[in-house]
């Protein structure tokens, strides 16, 4: 599994003496502890603060994942399910960046996995084939919501790139919905040339910046089921 490490300052002085954890602490916890690590008494509060501190009020994949934490025993049960789903995604599409964070999954699909026709939002045959590999996993874990983020490089105007990235994210949603996945599970957001992961000064860097990312989080059904299970 390819891991991308998060750099995040530790939040302090929250809810008197509540123990706080950094993103690294969350990421490095054992399977079910990944959810519990957020904190049994204030997981949702801490998650919201961490999500906001990851940029733009949580309007990034990592912000969406961490901002949606529940915490405590319920969060641990959700984290265990997410561990299993992450492994299945990795097996279905080897080489993809699959990152388990808190109670969710951050998935990065680069141009080698999901690409489009030049300056268009039309998925290539290769992109469709790779998305097809994810469909069975998403069907198996139907109690998750998926936010799709589109990114471009910095060539062209900012407004053009923002619009193109939105159209590309929407194209991915449309394709997956057409494969029998409920469209209500998906939301999309175009990020344009924001949040580059490499330099835009080289062809190689620009290629890496043209990508699609998923933030996979528990929906209300998974949360409710985990709450019931925690009471047993």
Label each region the model flagged:
Residues 102-132, 152-159:
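Short, solvent-exposed beta-strand/turn patches at coil↔beta or beta↔helix junctions
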Residues 151-225:
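Periplasmic OmpA-like peptidoglycan-binding domain that tethers envelope proteins to the cell wall
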Residues 87, 91, 125, 129-136, ...:
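Solvent-exposed, polar/charged alpha-helical surfaces in well-ordered, non-transmembrane soluble domains
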Residues 25-88:
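Short, low-complexity, glycine-enriched hydrophobic/amphipathic alpha-helices that associate
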Residues 18-22:
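C-terminal motif of bacterial Sec signal peptides marking the signal peptidase cleavage site
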Residues 82-113:
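Amphipathic, membrane-active segments
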């Amino acid at each position: 599994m390819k891991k991308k490490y998060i750099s995040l300052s530790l939040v302090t002085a929250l809810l008197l003496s509540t123990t706080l954890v950094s993103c690294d602490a969350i990421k490095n916890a054992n399977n079910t502890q990944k959810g519990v690590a957020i904190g049994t008494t204030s997981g949702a509060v801490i998650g919201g603060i961490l999500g906001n501190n990851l940029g733009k009020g949580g309007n990034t994949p990592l912000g969406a994942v961490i901002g949606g934490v529940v915490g405590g025993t319920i969060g641990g049960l959700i984290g265990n399910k997410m561990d299993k789903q992450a492994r299945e995604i990795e097996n279905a599409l080897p080489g993809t960046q699959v990152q388990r964070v808190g109670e969710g999954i951050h998935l990065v699909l680069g141009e080698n996995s999901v690409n489009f026709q030049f300056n268009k939002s039309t998925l290539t045959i290769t992109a469709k084939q790779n998305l097809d590999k994810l469909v069975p996993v998403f069907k198996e874990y139907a109690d998750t919501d998926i936010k799709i983020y589109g990114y471009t490089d910095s060539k062209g105007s900012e407004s053009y790139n923002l619009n193109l990235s939105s159209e590309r994210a929407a194209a991915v949603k449309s394709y997956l919905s057409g494969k029998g996945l409920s469209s209500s599970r998906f939301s999309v957001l175009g990020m344009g040339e924001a949040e580059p992961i490499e330099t835009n000064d080289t062809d190689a860097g620009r290629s890496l910046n043209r990508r699609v990312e998923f933030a996979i989080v528990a929906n209300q059904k998974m949360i409710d089921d985990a709450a019931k299970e925690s009471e047993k």
